[in-house]
Each structure stands twice: as C-alpha cells, then as structure tokens.
C-alpha cells in the first residue's frame, strides 16, 4: 500500500469510523496519524493500536476526514490547502462537493474524492471500533466531475486495504441510494421505537426478537443522525413521500385480503433484492431453531458442534425466553443444509424446533 500513498495517512476524527480505519490500515503496515478535537479520543484510539497522535506542523500525503457532517467541508478544505489528497467518509456526498467547491479553488478540488463505507454500529466512539469493521463491506467511492484519476485510484486502494469492496457511484446517485437503503430504514426504526414509549408495560412484556431487530438501529446517536438527515433532505423527502402513499394504501388494504396479500408479497420479493454475502446474489436460506441453556459455554458448544457437522452459518439471531433460563438460537443456513443440520443436532441431543 505504501507505494501509492507514501508512508503515512492522516485520519482526522478518532471516533468509530476513524479509529476503525486506523486499525484496518495499521494491520497492513501503514503508519497512521490521528487527530481529533478530543484528545481523550486520540489517546484511546492510539492505545488500541489505530495509529499515533499526528505531529504538529507536518502533512501526510493522504488525509481521511472522519468528523461530524457539519465539520467536513472546513476540514477537507484545510487539508487540500496543505497539499494532501483528501477523502471523507460522510453519509451524504453531493452537498459536500458543493460546499467544498466554494471553499477551495478548482485545482485543489481535483485532489478531493468523497467516499462512504457502508459499515457502522449503533454504538459510537473509539472503543466501539474494530479493524474488521469494513471486511467484505461495500465502500462507495464518489468522484465528482473534476476528481483526478490518481485521486480516485488512491482512495479505491485505501478502501481495499481496509478490507472493503469498492463501488464507484456519482455523488447524487449515492445520495438517492442511501436515502432508500440507509436513511429510510433508520427513520422507520426510530418511528417504531418511539411508539414503544407510550406502550403499557404488559404489552412490552410480549416483545420478541422481531421488535428488537426492527428497532436496534434506532439507538444511533441522535445528534449525528440529525445532521445526516438534514443534509440529505431532498432525496429523503422523495422516498418518504412514497412511503406516505404506501402507508395510506396499506391502511385501506387491511379490509381487502387480496390487496394485503399483494403488499406482503412485495415485501418478500423486496428482501430477495438485497445482495447476499460479499455482494453476490442472495441465496435461498432456511432457519434452524435450537434451544440453548443460558449457561456459560453452551453457545460455544453449539457452534463447535455445527462446525464439526460441517455446516456454514450464514447468519444467526438469539432470542431469550422470558420465563426460563433458555435462549432460542436461530441458525440461518443454506436451504439445502437445513434438514441435515437439524437431524445431526438432534443426534447430539440438542433440542431442535421443527
């Protein structure tokens, strides 16, 4: 990697994404400089092995800006003025191009390429970071019309070095895409979670894995999400208007079984449009449900047995029995592997629900 970026990369912003980028680059031998308004964040990230505090008065060949959305344009402009090649990891791209273009000259702007790793967590801060955060995840590279080829190639290689799979996409197209696949799901989770505030505790006692799955991402930092949503308001407003119409249709469909069937079938079909592992086509999967005692070592024993059986787990979920010290583990496997796995687990005395 050093042959195309020199021997240093400066990561500005030592939160979840910035620290994860530092950890990912450090594991492939890149020297990473870290800076942040919070010196505690820098010390924490450095202590985790994500890099070293950036020396005063020195410039790195490549700068990755991982600061809150409102601060990105100014930090990018400052780094471009210092002669660095710069990318940011903000969630919205075209408004940044416009704002940065008002702060720097045309020549400096050629050294800027936006990017957006499609990875994250409902948690924040350097302690939530991981060197593996980007492994196998899409990382959008969003060159604007005057981005230089060298700048685009460099940022693509940086993303690959972090373990990601790169996708080139125009900034406006990116913003429309994330409005649908990221920002809308977050808002739907927020609305569902918000409804729980007024629920009777007896109703909440019936909560299962479904409501946990739907609301998990609603726990994201409200201040950060406010900036993201406002900056992508035009694209998000369009998709929310479509959802508004569909909700009205859904309310009417509750009295029309055939119309309701169509809504539900569209939902099933939509899940098949989401790419599968490593960006490939979605594969047919099935779920195997296993009761696991809530004791130390039991989950590890289950995974060990599945590994010995020779079945690959595509995904998993864990639900807890409200009345007993037992968890229900849902193992998602390839459809053709489900029945053999059920039989093999029962032969090893696991309680399998058919």
Predicted regions and their residues:
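N-terminal Rossmann-like NAD(P) cofactor-binding module of classical short-chain dehydrogenase/reductase
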Residues: 63-64, 87
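Residues in the short beta-alpha loop(s) of Rossmann-like NAD(P)-binding domains
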Residues: 37-38, 90, 319
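Rossmann-like NAD(P)(H) cofactor-binding subdomain of soluble oxidoreductases
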Residues: 75-127
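Glycine-rich, N-terminal phosphate-binding loop of Rossmann-like dinucleotide-binding domains
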Residues: 66-68, 90, 143
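Internal alpha-helical scaffold of NAD(P)-dependent oxidoreductase catalytic cores
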Residues: 133-219
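Interdomain hinge/lid region at the active-site interface
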Residues: 200-268, 288
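A conserved regulatory-domain signal marking ACT and ACT-like small-molecule sensing domains
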Residues: 270-354
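NAD(P)+-binding Rossmann beta1-loop-alpha1 motif at the extreme N-terminus of oxidoreductases
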Residues: 1-54, 62
């Amino acid at each position: 990697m050093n042959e195309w970026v020199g021997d240093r990369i400066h990561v500005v912003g030592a939160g979840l994404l910035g620290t994860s980028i530092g950890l990912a680059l450090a594991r492939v031998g890149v020297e990473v400089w870290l800076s942040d308004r919070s010196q505690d964040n820098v010390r924490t990230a450095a202590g985790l092995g994500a890099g070293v505090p950036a020396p005063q008065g020195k410039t790195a060949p490549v700068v990755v800006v991982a600061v809150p959305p409102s601060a990105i344009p100014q930090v990018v402009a400052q780094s471009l003025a210092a002669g660095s090649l710069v990318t940011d990891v903000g969630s919205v791209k075209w408004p940044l191009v416009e704002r940065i273009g008002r702060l720097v000259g045309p020549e400096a702007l050629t050294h800027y390429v936006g990017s957006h790793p499609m990875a994250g967590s409902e948690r924040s801060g350097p302690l939530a970071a991981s060197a593996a955060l980007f492994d196998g995840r899409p990382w959008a590279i969003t060159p604007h019309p005057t981005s230089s080829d060298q700048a685009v190639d460099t940022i693509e290689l940086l993303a690959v070095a972090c373990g990601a799979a790169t996708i080139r996409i125009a900034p406006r197209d990116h913003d429309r895409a994330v409005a649908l696949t990221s920002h809308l799901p977050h808002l739907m989770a927020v609305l569902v979670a918000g409804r729980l505030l007024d629920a009777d505790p007896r109703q909440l006692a019936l909560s299962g894995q479904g409501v946990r799955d739907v609301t998990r991402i609603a726990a994201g930092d409200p201040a950060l999400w406010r900036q993201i949503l406002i900056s992508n308001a035009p694209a998000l407003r369009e998709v929310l208007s479509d959802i508004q119409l569909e909700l009205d249709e859904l309310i009417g469909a509750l009295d029309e079984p055939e119309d309701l069937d169509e809504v539900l079938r569209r939902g099933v079909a939509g899940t098949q449009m989401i790419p599968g592992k490593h960006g490939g086509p979605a594969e047919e999967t099935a779920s195997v449900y296993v009761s696991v005692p809530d004791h130390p070592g039991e989950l590890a024993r289950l995974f060990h047995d599945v590994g010995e059986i020779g079945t690959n787990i595509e995904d998993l979920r864990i639900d807890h029995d409200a009345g007993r010290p037992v968890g229900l583990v849902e193992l998602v496997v390839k459809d053709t592997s489900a029945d053999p796995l059920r039989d093999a687990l029962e032969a090893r005395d696991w309680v399998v629900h058919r």
